[in-house]
Amino acid sequence: MRDSDIGIWWVDAFTDRAGGGNPAAVCALSKPLAPAVMQAVAAELGLSETAFVEPPGSEGVRPLRWFTPSVEVDLCGHATLAAAHVLADASSSVRFATRSGEVAVARLGERGLELDFPAATVGEEPSGEAGLAELAGALGETPVWAGRGGPDVLVELPSAAAVAEC
């Protein structure tokens, strides 16, 4: 890989001062890289997330992927914000194609960015009462409702106090 194939930025998201906020690396690629190479770069950089942005396709949408030092993740808000900060000029918008769907970013004024993430689909946990009983045993509290959003189980508990006790 030549030096010109990748530009790397360290961006502190959600702050206006260096060293604050939530850091992410942004790698602007001149061509796609193999996932193993992206994983190795993310591991070497050592931040919680590294965003890899490819050049835009024919419709202007840029492929975007996120890697932790050990695994690729489906979505990362602060690294998306960091990538948009690196790529969006004062008057532009950016669209990213991700494993979670398309993310649109619009410039708001001189320093603001608005991110529009795809809505996650959540369905009720199909295992019904048996599933709720199993969750109650694991949590020490009976859930009001449980559902799935992708590989994640979402649980509604009866109160904030019940959440604090878990």
Model-derived features: positions:
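Active-site proximal loop and beta-alpha junction motif in alpha/beta enzyme cores
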Residues: 1-75, 79-166
